[in-house]
C-alpha cells in the first residue's frame, strides 16, 4: 500500500505527495530525475558465518550481534545452507547441515583497526557460548568475504537453476517481529510443504525481521495455478492474521500482493489509499491493478509462463546478473533480454516485427565472449546459444566457406595482408576520402568492405621456427 505516514510526517501538500510517490510504484506519478546522497563506506570489514542447530537458537544469538553494532545480519535456513554445494569452493560441508538448522551471516564495518581486532576476538567467543559454530572463524579478506556473501546473493538464482525446466520462480518478501521468526519459519515451511513447494528456501535480514522465501512453481497447468493461489492465501493469513506482520518490507506490492492490501491495513486506511489514487489518477491510467486493485483475483491472472527455448538457456531466472558485463548492453540487448525475447517468440506472444529486429539486436551484435557465464549464478553462456542460432541460420554455402577458411587460415591472413597493402597504396593515389566513397558503394553490393583511413599497414608474417630443440617449457615475459 501507500506510505500513509507521509500524511502526518509532513504539512505541505507537495511534500506529502512527493513522499507518497516514492513508494507508489508508478501508480500516482513518476520521478524523472532523482538526486541520491551517498553513505559512508568504512574501509575495514570483518564477517562470519555462524551455524546453529535451530532457528530459535540463531535468533537467541541475534542480540549479541546487534548490540555490538553489526551492520548486516542475514538468517539462512537449512535449505538455503545446502545450496552452498553448487559453489565452486563451498565454505563448509553441506552434508553436515542438519534438518531445521539455521545460520547467521553477519558483517561489521569499521574505521579503526583496533575496533576490528576487538570484534574478531570477542564475537566468536560470545557466539560459541550460545551454541554457535563458526567453520571459518572471522574473515576480513575481501576475496573470502565475497565468497561468503555469494551464498546469500545466489540463493534466488540457485533455486532457479534446480527447478524443472519450464517452471518459474517466486520470491516473496515478508516482515515480522524478529522474536517471532522461529515460529514463523517453522509454519512457513509447513505451508510450503502443504502446497508442494518442496524446494523452498527461507532467508532474510534477521535484525529487521525481514524474511524472503524463494521456490519454483509450475504455472503451465490449472493445478499449478491453484497451488500458487493457495500458497499466497495461506501466507497472507499467517503473516497478517496470526503474527500481525507485513506482507511487504522492501519489495514492491505489485500485482501479487495488491488483493491483500485491504486485509493488512483495514477498510478505513484502504479507502484513504483509494482516495489518493483517484485524486492523482482518476482514470486509472498509471499502472492499473498495481498496488491497489478491485479485482481480488488479479494475482492469479495473466501469469507469466516460461516457454522452453533451448537447453542452454532454459534454466535462466532472468535475475540480470549478466547485464553489467555484457559488451552490447548499451548498443542493443543484454543476455537476459535475448533470452526473454526468445521465450516470447517460443510462446507465440511476440509481434512479427520482433522477429526481424532480433536478427540484428539479438544475434548479430552478441560478442559471444562468455562474460555472461562468469557473472551468471547458474553458469549460463548466452553466447553459446547465439552461436547455435547463427549456425542454424547459416546457409550451406556459408558453412562451406567458413569451414574452408578455418582450415586455411594462413591463406586468409595472406589475403588480408594483401588487401591492406593494396588499400594503403590506392589511398596514396586517390586519397582517403575518395577511396572511402568508392568502397561505400562496392560494400553495398558485397564486393568489398568499406575503407577506413585509420586502418593499419599490413603486418609482416611471423617467423616460423622449424627446428625443435626439445625444450619442455617456454616462458614468455611481456
Segment roles from a protein language model:
Residues 285-290, 321-344, 365-392:
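Iron-sulfur cluster-binding cysteine motifs and their immediate structural context
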Residues 161-165, 351-478:
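Iron-sulfur-cluster electron-transfer modules
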Residues 93-97, 221-225, 266-272, 339, ...:
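Short, structured secondary-structure boundary patches
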Residues 1-249, 254-295, 299-300, 304-328:
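Noncatalytic alpha-helical scaffold of FAD-dependent oxidoreductases
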Residues 163-167, 342-347:
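N-terminal small/glycine-rich loop or linker at the start of catalytic domains
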Residues 298-318, 347-368:
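Ferredoxin-like iron-sulfur electron-transfer modules
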Residues 132-137, 174, 329-332, 408, ...:
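Generic preference for hydrophobic/aromatic residues in regular secondary structure cores
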Amino acid at each position: 500500500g501507500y506510505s500513509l505516514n507521509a500524511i502526518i510526517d509532513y504539512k505541505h501538500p507537495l511534500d506529502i505527495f512527493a513522499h507518497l510517490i516514492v513508494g507508489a510504484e508508478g501508480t500516482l506519478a513518476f520521478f524523472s530525475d532523482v538526486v541520491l546522497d551517498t553513505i559512508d563506506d568504512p574501509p575495514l570489514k570483518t564477517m562470519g558465518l555462524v551455524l546453529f542447530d535451530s532457528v530459535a537458537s540463531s535468533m537467541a544469538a541475534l542480540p549479541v550481534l546487534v548490540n555490538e553494532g553489526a551492520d548486516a545480519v542475514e538468517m539462512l535456513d537449512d535449505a538455503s545452507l545446502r545450496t552452498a554445494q553448487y559453489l565452486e569452493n563451498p565454505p563448509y560441508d553441506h552434508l553436515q547441515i542438519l534438518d531445521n538448522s539455521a545460520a547467521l551471516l553477519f558483517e561489521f564495518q569499521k574505521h579503526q583497526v583496533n575496533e576490528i581486532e576487538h570484534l574478531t576476538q570477542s564475537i566468536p567467543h560470545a557466539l560459541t557460548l550460545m551454541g554457535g559454530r563458526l567453520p571459518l572463524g572471522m574473515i576480513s579478506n575481501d576475496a573470502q568475504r565475497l565468497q561468503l556473501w555469494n551464498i546469500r546473493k545466489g540463493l534466488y538464482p540457485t533455486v532457479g537453476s534446480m527447478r524443472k525446466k519450464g517452471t518459474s520462480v517466486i520470491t516473496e518478501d515478508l516482515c515480522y517481529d524478529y522474536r517471532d521468526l522461529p515460529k514463523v519459519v517453522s509454519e512457513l515451511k509447513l505451508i510450503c510443504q502443504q502446497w508442494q513447494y518442496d524446494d523452498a528456501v527461507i532467508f532474510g535480514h534477521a535484525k529487521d525481521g525481514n524474511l524472503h522465501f524463494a521456490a519454483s512453481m509450475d504455472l503451465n497447468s490449472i493445478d499449478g495455478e491453484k497451488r500458487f493461489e493457495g500458497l499466497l492465501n495461506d501466507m497472507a493469513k499467517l503473516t497478517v492474521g496470526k503474527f500481525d506482520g507485513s506482507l511487504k518490507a522492501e519489495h514492491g506490492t505489485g500485482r501479487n500482493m495488491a488483493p491483500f492490501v485491504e486485509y493488512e491495513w483495514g477498510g478505513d486506511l484502504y479507502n484513504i489509499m483509494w482516495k489518493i489514487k483517484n485524486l492523482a489518477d482518476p482514470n486509472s491510467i498509471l499502472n492499473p491493478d498495481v498496488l491497489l486493485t478491485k479485482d481480488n483475483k488479479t494475482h492469479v491472472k495473466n501469469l507469466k509462463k516460461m516457454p522452453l527455448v533451448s537447453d542452454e538457456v532454459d534454466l535462466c531466472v532472468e535475475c540480470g546478473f549478466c547485464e553489467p558485463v555484457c559488451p552490447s548492453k548499451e548498443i542493443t540487448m543484454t543476455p537476459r533480454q535475448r533470452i526473454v525475447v526468445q521465450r516470447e517468440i517460443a510462446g507465440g506472444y511476440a509481434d512479427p516485427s520482433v522477429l526481424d529486429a532480433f536478427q540484428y539486436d539479438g544475434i548479430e551484435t552478441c560478442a559471444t565472449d562468455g562474460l555472461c557465464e562468469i557473472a551468471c549464478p547458474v553458469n549460463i553462456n548466452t553466447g553459446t546459444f547465439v552461436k547455435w542460432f547463427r549456425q542454424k541460420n547459416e546457409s550451406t554455402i556459408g558453412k562451406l566457406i567458413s569451414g574452408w577458411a578455418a582450415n586455411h587460415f594462413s591463406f586468409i591472413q595472406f589475403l588480408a595482408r594483401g588487401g591492406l597493402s593494396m588499400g594503403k597504396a590506392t589511398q596514396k593515389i586517390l586519397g582517403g576520402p575518395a577511396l572511402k566513397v568508392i568502397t561505400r558503394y562496392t560494400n553495398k553490393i558485397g564486393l568489398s568492405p568499406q575503407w577506413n583511413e585509420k586502418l593499419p599497414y599490413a603486418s609482416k608474417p611471423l617467423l616460423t621456427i622449424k627446428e625443435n630443440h626439445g625444450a619442455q617449457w617456454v616462458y614468455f615475459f611481456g
